[in-house]
């Protein structure tokens, strides 16, 4: 799948524009602050209904504009296309449209337009809180396991009920026991989905990483959020008093984590920033391979400021791996020459010059 058309209005400093991207490689180049990252942000908004630069969408809306809007036409792998649209105004009203119909949730966007983001903050996947790694893990499970979303919703409902009971004691014993059973059932299913996903991801990740950088002894493991030798029901019963004191459930899938270690050490404590970026790139490219194996279609990769913290050899290796995925890629850089020569001669490459919010599609030398 790929975006064949993107229209952006009212996003940060960007002038209204309609782009016709290449189905493969798209390079956005220009000076710092010109608006390159805002183009990626607009595409991210279209696919996830969130910004990767701000937890709030109000700052995304251009100064003195009433709203921001992004439309896109997605060419589907199975043929045909789907039209997506997102809009957010200053009053907080958010609208998602799919093929002319209002959508119920952003998950419907994500299912049609799976996006992967690689940017200067990517190292947070290793250094940041477990929540970031759970989001990474669950993105992958969501795109390969059709039952994940409904099970996840069951888990969240049961967890919310239990936490409310822990804080306020509003349930009778029978109701509390029923919600605990539902929590344990949903937790076991989520754990099963996650374990199966990590089992599939590990060999692909290890192969991908070996083509990017040599890191002997790096291991990836999964912690499910409670003792692997015990049933969750047993753990919940034994930790009930402490859970009541804390006001929330301390064991379960909501405490899961991915652990990357180099020998006996946390990888984030040992690796350089450049090495961390390569590890994250390998993880996200491996996810793309799994998506392509399970569903007809590929992820779309948004790569912001690729040259930073990577030398020429590593940049070329990363470009080669992205190219081998045969997916659509949007990459930003200051100097197009960093990336222009990194592709095979038969790979369609489009160049976009961004200057003070204006985007001009230029011609590649292969055209």
From Swiss-Prot:
ATP binds at residues 30-37. It is found in: Cytoplasm. InterPro entries: DNA-binding_RecF, DNA-binding_RecF_CS, P-loop_NTPase, RecF/RecN/SMC_N, RecF_2. One of its GO terms (biological process) is DNA synthesis involved in DNA repair. Keywords: ATP-binding, Cytoplasm, DNA damage, DNA repair, DNA replication, DNA-binding, Nucleotide-binding, SOS response. GO terms for cellular component: cytoplasm. PANTHER family: DNA REPLICATION AND REPAIR PROTEIN RECF. HAMAP family: RecF. This is DNA replication and repair protein RecF. It comes from Pseudomonas syringae pv. tomato (strain ATCC BAA-871 / DC3000).
